[in-house]
Structures are given as C-alpha cells and as structure tokens.
C-alpha cells in the first residue's frame, strides 16, 4: 500500500526535520488518522520526493525527511489542456482528471458560449480552488510536479500568446484526425470548447492563429468528456500510455 503523500510548497531539504504546513498536518492527523512515527511521502513540486516520518503533530507538527528520491511520473508528452469555462462542478472534474492523465498545465478560457461567467475576485478564487484540486490530484496519482492552472483568459488573449509547439482545436465535423498526424516534436496544446461549442468566429480566429482543427470520432462529446478523451488519445499515441518515450 502506498504511503500517504503530501505537497509542501516550501522547498524541502534532505535529511533534516521540517515544520509541516498546518493544512497538511490537519489532513494527516484529523482526516487520515495518522500518528507520530507513521511514514509519509512529501514533495515540493521541484522534482522528486522524500520518504519522511511524522515526528510531532498538534500545534507544532514536524516530519523527519530522508534523501530526495529521483522519482518522476511525468509523461514524455507535454500537453496543456485549454478548457473553455464549463458550468457547475465540471471544471473541478476536468482539472482533477487532466492532472491524473498527465497534463502539464490547464488553461481556462472564457468562450462566447461559456455558461459560467467569472471575473475579478470570483475568478481569482475559482482559479485558486482549481489549483488546490490539481495539488490533490498529484498527491493521489503519484506526480511530483504540480501542473499550473492559469488565470482565466479570453480566447483571443490566449491565442495572442506565443505558441509553444502545436495547437489543436477540437470541433465536431473537422476533417483532421489524430491518428493521421505525425508524432509531435514538442509541446502540445488542446483547445476544448464550452457546452455550446466554439462559435464560427472563434474557430476562424483559432485557425488564423495557427490552430489545427480536429475531430474526435463521429460523436459529439460533452465539454467535460472531450478534453479527457483527447488527453487519453494523445497519451496512447505518443505519450506514456504507449509504452514508448520517443517524444
């Protein structure tokens, strides 16, 4: 059974005793019912992880760290999921599963047909919430590098950013298909539309910005399904689901 894993955002130092963040200690003691002497795994997002032992709990929680272990669970394929805002708790689900499926970043975008509208403090709080979901997904899935959930951008603002690698935009009926593409030579970004799909103007804007339109089969997928299906397909073709590391 895997030892409980916790993210500690402060840089961890090998072979020493550290103060645990209170939120980590609360989860360990109150939720998981761990006790002094129990083994845990700590990671700081800088790569690798530490086998550690709880040495004190309560108001001044401590853990004794061993050496940094060079363990990584990252895919050779660097995929950013560019997800149009979706209503309800769909974004929570998408962020969690995207991290489990190996995305290196999640970029929320406000689309013309997005039901969810966020701005100002509400937007900042929601992004912080999604970032915590990404942290929890790393703790659960064994990843030691936490994907960044970006601030909410308009589609136009996102497309104006310098493109790093290939950008794919999913839309039903597109002529392009993943299986006919050559293996990418760098990072990938996959753009997923909202509940009502991308508008014609958005598709035109994306294509002018160099995005390649693709369809995932003959069926219309829900927004919370499409990105995860795309991530799974990409990891199977060229990532760590393929058993190959040629990317």
Locate each region found by the language model:
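Residue-level signal for inorganic ion chemistry
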Residues: 37, 98, 134, 206, ...
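Generic structural signal for residues in well-ordered beta-strands
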Residues: 40, 63, 146-150, 213
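Active-site/ligand-binding-proximal alpha/beta "capping" segment
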Residues: 162-203, 212-215
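Structured adenosyl-cofactor binding patch, chiefly the S-adenosyl-L-methionine
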Residues: 200-247
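Glycine/charged-rich beta-loop-alpha catalytic/anionic-binding loops adjacent to active sites
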Residues: 18-20, 76-80, 186-189, 208-216
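Short, ordered loop/turn segments at secondary-structure junctions
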Residues: 11, 68, 110-114, 218-219
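RNA substrate-binding interface of SAM-dependent RNA methyltransferases
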Residues: 72-168
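N-terminal positively charged helical leader segments and presequences
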Residues: 1-70, 121
